[in-house]
Amino acid sequence: MTKKLFDLQGKNVLLTGASKGMGLSMAQGLVNHGANVVISSRKLDQCQKAADAINESSGQKKAFAYSCNASSKEELQELVEFSIAELGSITTLVCNAGVNSFFGSMSEIDDESYDKTMDTNVKSNHWLINMVTPSMKESGGGSIMITSSIAAFHASETLGTYSISKLAVLGLVRNYASELGPSNI
């Protein structure tokens, strides 16, 4: 039997951007180590397919599906409420949802595309953190992780807004770490 590097039994994770790719791999890994996970993305059918596959491979119902547009504050609040109803609490928040809504020069980007990238990649994380931290503080702490990108460290002639958003995520993380660290988050 292979020894696990760590045990996540009893941990309840809300994971955005989790129906495919890196998010799906994170969800599978979290469940493999014992966590319960709410899998969220915009498309419910993809979330459900991911949750079903994870539950089948684990032999337990540890993954739950919920569709949510990460750029909608109301939908994020509903996601948090669903997660607490299904899991009992949220001990860990993993913000993995992200978009690049424009490929081209910064001088050519329209306001709508700029706002969509910043809202999804930055503002949604800010909202979610503020939605989950009160209960984390009450329970003595928690964990918050936000996916950034190497793009945060490099200028790009075609991915400028995405790069800006991922650099902003790093600032968000540093500031929340300073603010929430004393609360064991």
Model feature map: region roles:
Residues G104-M106, D110-D115:
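Substrate-binding pocket helix/loop in short-chain dehydrogenase/reductase
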Residues H33-K49:
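Conserved glycine-rich Rossmann-like NAD(P)H-binding loop of the short-chain dehydrogenase/reductase
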Residues M106-S107, H154-G160, P182-S183:
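Active-site loop immediately N-terminal to the catalytic Tyr-X3-Lys motif
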Residues P134, S178-P182:
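Alpha-helical segment proximal to the catalytic Tyr-Lys
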Residues N12, S19-G21:
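Conserved glycine-rich cofactor-binding loop
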Residues S149:
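Residue(s) in the substrate-gating loop at a strand-loop-helix junction
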Residues I129, S165, V173:
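Active-site helix of classical SDR
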